[in-house]
C-alpha cells in the first residue's frame, strides 16, 4: 500500500524532517501511522507520532485504539512492511529493522489480518 504521507511530501523533505526529529529527540522514533486500504476502521486524526523507543508494539496498538476510539470488541491489526510485528517487540527494534530510507517507520492499521496467516509468524 502506498503511503499518503509519502505522496504528499517529497523524499528530501521527509528525510530532513526525520533527521531533525532523531537529532532533537534521541530516544524517540518518528512513526507514520495510516489506515490500511480496505479497512472499515475510522481514519486516525493524527498520523505522525514520536514514539518512545522502549514502547512495545502492543502498547503502540493501544495508543492507536484510543486515538481512533475503537471499541474493545473490535479487532485491530498493525502492519509494518506488510507483516504483523510481534506484540512484545520494542518499537526501537522494529524501527531498526524496518525504517524507510527517509528515516520514518511506516505503520498501517486494519480491522482484518489482510495478509493471511503467514503474516502472524513474521520473524524478528
Swiss-Prot record:
Disulfide-linked positions: none
GO cellular component: autophagosome membrane; cytoplasmic vesicle
Protein name: Autophagy-related protein 8
One GO term of the biological process aspect: protein transport
Swiss-Prot/TrEMBL keywords: Autophagy, Cytoplasmic vesicle, Lipoprotein, Membrane, Protein transport, Transport, Ubl conjugation pathway, Vacuole
Cell compartments where the protein resides: Cytoplasmic vesicle, Autophagosome membrane; Vacuole membrane
Lineage: Eukaryota, Fungi, Dikarya, Ascomycota, Saccharomycotina
Family, similarity comment: Belongs to the ATG8 family.
Sites of Phosphatidylethanolamine amidated glycine lipidation: 116
Superkingdom of origin: Eukaryota
Propeptide stretch(es), residue numbers: 117-124
KW Cytoplasm (keyword) present: no
Organism field: Kluyveromyces lactis (strain ATCC 8585 / CBS 2359 / DSM 70799 / NBRC 1267 / NRRL Y-1140 / WM37) (Yeast)
Gene: ATG8
Post-translational modification summary for this protein: The C-terminal 8 residues are removed to expose Gly-116 at the C-terminus. The C-terminal Gly is then amidated with phosphatidylethanolamine by an activating system similar to that for ubiquitin.
Classification via CDD domains: Ubl_ATG8 (cd16128)
Topology relative to the membrane: Lipid-anchor
General function of this protein: Ubiquitin-like modifier involved in autophagosome formation. With ATG4, mediates the delivery of the autophagosomes to the vacuole via the microtubule cytoskeleton. Required for selective autophagic degradation of the nucleus (nucleophagy) as well as for mitophagy which contributes to regulate mitochondrial quantity and quality by eliminating the mitochondria to a basal level to fulfill cellular energy requirements and preventing excess ROS production. Participates also in membrane fusion events that take place in the early secretory pathway.
Amino acid at each position: 500500500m502506498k503511503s499518503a504521507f509519502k505522496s504528499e511530501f517529497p523524499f528530501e523533505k521527509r528525510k530532513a524532517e526525520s533527521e531533525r526529529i532523531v537529532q532533537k529527540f534521541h530516544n524517540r522514533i518518528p512513526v507514520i501511522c495510516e489506515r490500511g486500504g480496505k479497512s472499515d476502521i475510522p481514519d486516525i486524526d493524527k498520523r505522525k507520532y514520536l514514539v518512545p523507543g522502549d514502547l512495545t508494539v502492543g502498547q503502540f496498538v493501544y495508543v492507536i485504539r484510543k486515538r481512533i476510539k475503537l471499541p474493545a470488541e473490535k479487532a485491530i491489526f498493525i502492519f509494518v512492511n506488510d507483516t504483523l510485528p510481534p506484540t512484545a517487540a520494542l518499537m526501537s527494534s522494529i524501527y531498526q529493522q524496518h525504517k524507510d530510507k527517509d528515516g520514518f517507520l511506516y505503520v498501517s492499521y486494519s480491522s482484518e489480518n489482510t495478509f493471511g496467516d503467514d503474516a502472524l509468524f513474521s520473524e524478528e
